[in-house]
Amino acid sequence: VHEHRAEINEWLLKTSKLVRAQARSPKRPKKISRGSVLIGAKLKGLDLRGANLRRALLIAADLRNADLRMSDFIGADVREADLSGADLTGSIFLTQAQVNTANGDANTKLPPSLQIPAHWVTNR
């Protein structure tokens, strides 16, 4: 099982690198990377395209209007993070379970495989 898991992880890492390379932002802050502790961080409106957010702690982070296109969210903790108006188009390894723990609104752009949770403000 360990060998199989290691092989799968290698493929996930390669996929992440290929996807994120297409969208890397030269303006992305250096403090944002794999495993970053960004609990309560003020990241509103930042260009985070192609960010490696694997295992990042984004609990209660302010990501309103942030550009998170093609970012890697595998294992990221986004509980109570504010994704209102954020663009997560093309993000990889972002799950419905993660989205369900975050906050957002009708202006949040999600990958097509995910749905806006019922608790988000949708201005219907």
Please identify what each model-predicted range represents:
Residues 1-26:
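Terminal amphipathic alpha-helical/low-complexity segments used for targeting or macromolecular assembly
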Residues 21-124:
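Tandem repeat scaffolds
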